[in-house]
């Protein structure tokens, strides 16, 4: 396809190996260092991109405190080859933070406010816990269901509303680990994982080029034996069918179609459309349905036109209703999360939006797809979606 000057193109994507938050490979690596390493290596890999041209580093991060505080985008950028004259901002849309970072860069390019951007995100959930420093307003319960901030309970609610069984969830969780392991063995993650140093279980420093979160030994029987994690009496959502708590970062180089053509760069993809949407916080995980419908309408497409889909696996009980109402549940094995998802790889909040987008682009490239959708739910009732076309 030919590019228009203000088209938004993805030049390259990379991510860290996903590390377990409890005693994992990144336990002695700070979030800023993880981010800076990733940005530096991705720029090194793309020699035609001059770091001096970077308009802004836009980095997603949810818990912006401790080592992730004081604008971690700038903290990380200062430790890379990007000059001090380039800007940096940290953004949060909870789970959708780094996809929002991508959207912010895209909107700037579309409106002529820059040509080259570095976007992505990080979350070190081992160093900065999910609830560190959080003080929810008790008056929120006057406006939304009291349990709306407990993501696992919103997944229970959504699963119950849509008749999702425990066995269906366990099968979905098993699928995630099996596909992620298969992708690892077959080298499908080779282009997206940027190797980095970390510590193994014995405390030895080594270079990791694989995700340590995947459990190939997972069985249906093992998953069936797990107790409910959020609703002890009658619940169906378990640790085995929920996204893992992990540490990781993801990064993309994004630019205008004109600049890519000027530099002789063959992009991975162009953004066709973007959308966000809100839903009742009590069914937080349903957000990808309206946001995807909105994005497809903006692109003049239907779900039947889409070759591959990456849906963030916050919970199996959440993902299955979304796939059902997007009318792709019966095509899941052909189109959806072909390299596994967050149940196997984890969901470091600030990292995941760019991570699923980049993984989607690799799936499209490896399987000859043209159109793809990356979408995810967002805590407290939102959805965010990006439609990509491979070029």
Curated annotation (Swiss-Prot):
GO terms for biological process: fatty acid beta-oxidation; phenylacetate catabolic process. The keyword Metal-binding does not apply. It is an enzyme of class 2 (transferase). It catalyses: an acyl-CoA + acetyl-CoA = a 3-oxoacyl-CoA + CoA. Keywords: Acyltransferase, Cytoplasm, Fatty acid metabolism, Lipid degradation, Lipid metabolism, Transferase. SUPFAM superfamilies: Thiolase-like. It holds the Pfam family Thiolase_C. The keyword Lipid metabolism applies. GO terms for molecular function: acetyl-CoA C-acyltransferase activity. It is found in: Cytoplasm. One of its GO terms (cellular component) is cytoplasm. Pathway: Lipid metabolism; fatty acid beta-oxidation. Its EC number is 2.3.1.16. The active site is at 95 (acyl-thioester intermediate), 347 (proton acceptor), 377 (proton acceptor). Gene3D superfamilies: 3.40.47.10. HAMAP family: FadA. Belongs to the thiolase-like superfamily. Thiolase family. PANTHER family: 3-KETOACYL-COA THIOLASE FADA, 3-KETOACYL-COA THIOLASE, PEROXISOMAL. Catalyzes the final step of fatty acid oxidation in which acetyl-CoA is released and the CoA ester of a fatty acid two carbons shorter is formed. Heterotetramer of two alpha chains (FadB) and two beta chains (FadA). This is 3-ketoacyl-CoA thiolase. It comes from Pseudomonas putida (strain ATCC 700007 / DSM 6899 / JCM 31910 / BCRC 17059 / LMG 24140 / F1).
């Amino acid at each position: 396809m030919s590019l228009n000057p203000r088209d938004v193109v993805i030049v390259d994507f990379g991510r860290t190996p996903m590390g377990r938050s409890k005693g994992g490979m990144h336990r002695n690596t700070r979030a800023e260092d993880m981010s800076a390493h990733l940005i530096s290596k991705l720029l090194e890999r793309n020699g035609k991109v001059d770091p001096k041209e970077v308009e802004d580093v836009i980095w997603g991060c949810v818990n912006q405190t401790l080592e992730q505080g004081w604008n971690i985008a700038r903290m990380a950028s200062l430790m890379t080859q990007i000059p001090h004259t380039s800007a940096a901002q940290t953004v949060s849309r909870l789970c959708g933070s780094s996809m929002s970072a991508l959207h912010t860069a895209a909107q700037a390019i579309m409106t002529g406010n820059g040509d080259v951007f570095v976007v992505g995100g990080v979350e070190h959930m081992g160093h900065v816990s999910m609830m560190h420093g959080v003080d929810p307003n008790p008056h929120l319960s006057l406006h939304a269901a009291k349990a709306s901030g407990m993501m696992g309970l919103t997944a229970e609610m959504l699963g119950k509303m849509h008749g999702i069984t425990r066995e269906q969830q366990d099968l979905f969780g098993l699928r995630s680990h099996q596909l992620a392991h298969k992708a690892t063995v077959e080298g499908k993650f080779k282009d997206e994982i940027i190797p980095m140093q970390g510590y193994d279980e014995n405390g030895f420093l080594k270079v990791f080029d694989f995700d340590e979160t995947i459990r190939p030994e997972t069985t249906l029987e093992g998953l069936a034996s797990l107790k409910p994690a959020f609703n002890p009496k009658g619940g169906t959502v378990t640790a085995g069918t929920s996204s893992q708590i992990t540490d990781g970062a993801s990064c993309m180089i994004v630019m205008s179609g004109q600049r890519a053509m000027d530099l002789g760069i063959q992009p991975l993809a162009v953004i066709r459309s973007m959308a966000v949407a809100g839903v009742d916080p009590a069914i937080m995980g349903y957000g990808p349905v309206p946001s995807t419908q909105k994005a497809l309408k903006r692109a003049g497409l239907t779900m039947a036109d889409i070759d591959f889909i990456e849906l963030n696996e916050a919970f199996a009980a959440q993902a299955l209703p979304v796939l059902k109402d997007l009318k792709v549940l019966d095509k899941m094995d052909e189109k959806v999360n072909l390299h596994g998802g967050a149940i196997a790889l984890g969901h470091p909040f600030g990292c995941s939006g760019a991570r699923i987008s980049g993984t989607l682009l690799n799936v499209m490239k490896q399987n000859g797809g043209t159109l793809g959708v990356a979408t995810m739910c967002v805590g407290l009732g939102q959805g965010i979606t990006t439609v990509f076309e491979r070029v």
